[in-house]
């Protein structure tokens, strides 16, 4: 049985979820994307326009913490059976979340209840999780706390994984499958809504520049995870001669008897990557850097010499 779906999302993930659901016989009665920022067109918006799906670009659905009446009325007019939240960044009021007769389904890129919050991808790497996965749940009044409908795991987090590779290579395709499975289960009346186990719950805040700042008193393993977890955004960083420098394409080198202060630039490796001394006989290998507000360049082109010190 095809459902009338109101989809809230963005980017290629939102597009692919919408296309997958449409192929399964569901009708997109409303597609909500972020307002047009004047840059590259949103892939979900483009797909909606090509297929004639009703498209909305609202900046907000609440004002001063209260649901905007015009948004509630508009949403009700679509007579959606189900809301599908495909990586949306907007905060929807309960009147919209609970409006459709079948409620809402929301995607999250972790194995809930672990790693709740808006930067789950980064924190899984930063905190050394060994396995990743995705969850589709029914949202409630909490942050990523609602009952689970579909969960898919078994994704190992490799030693060279970044937030970007974890998402695009693994959790993105797995997430599209999970969303399709969850909608099918709801449509067919066989969905189970399993409460989350609070004993295994964790919540992490946003990964901002304070989190991304490298602390050279930490061991190389912790610094390597932070660099990879913050790649590509916001980019782990340290100061060189009073200037912020962000690191990308990082990896850990163990068993290095460098005898140097952590943060000191060592001789580059055979591939030209920057090597930086870290605590515990380790070094960080860096492929690309971005100085201040400049562009990313190869570490060899950074102009930061051997013997330079990051603080």
Task: Report residues per predicted region.
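C-terminal active-site/capping subdomain that shapes the small-molecule cofactor and substrate pocket
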Residues: 224-311
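One-carbon transfer enzymes
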Residues: 1-234, 282, 291-295, 300, ...
């Amino acid at each position: 049985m095809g459902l009338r779906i109101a989809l809230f999302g963005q980017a290629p993930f939102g597009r692919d979820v919408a296309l997958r659901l449409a192929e399964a016989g569901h009708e997109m009665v409303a597609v909500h994307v972020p307002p047009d920022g004047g840059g590259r067109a949103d892939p979900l918006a483009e797909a909606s326009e090509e297929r004639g799906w009703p498209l909305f670009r609202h900046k907000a659905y609440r004002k001063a913490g209260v649901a905007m009446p015009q948004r509630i009325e508009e949403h009700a007019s679509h007579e959606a059976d189900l809301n599908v939240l495909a990586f949306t960044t907007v905060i929807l009021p309960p009147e919209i979340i609970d409006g459709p007769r079948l409620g809402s389904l929301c995607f999250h890129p972790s194995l809930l209840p672990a790693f709740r919050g808006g930067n789950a991808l980064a924190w899984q790497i930063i905190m050394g999780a060994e396995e990743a996965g995705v969850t589709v749940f029914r949202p409630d009044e909490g942050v990523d706390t609602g009952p689970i409908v579909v969960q898919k795991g078994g994704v190992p987090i490799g030693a060279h994984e970044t937030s970007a590779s974890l998402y695009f290579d693994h959790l993105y395709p797995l997430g599209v499958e999970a969303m399709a499975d969850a909608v099918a289960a709801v449509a067919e009346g066989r969905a189970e809504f399993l409460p989350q186990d609070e004993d295994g719950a964790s919540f992490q805040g946003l990964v901002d520049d304070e989190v991304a700042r490298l602390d050279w008193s930490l061991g190389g393993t912790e610094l390597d995870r932070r660099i990879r977890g913050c790649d590509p955004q916001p980019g782990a960083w340290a100061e060189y001669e009073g200037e912020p420098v962000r690191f990308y394409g990082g990896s850990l080198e163990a068993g290095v008897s460098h005898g140097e202060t952590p943060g000191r630039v060592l001789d580059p490796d055979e591939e030209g990557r920057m090597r930086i001394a870290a605590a515990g006989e380790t070094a960080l290998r860096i492929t690309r850097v971005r100085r201040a507000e400049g562009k990313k360049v190869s570490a060899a082109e950074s102009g930061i010499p051997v013997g330079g010190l990051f603080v």
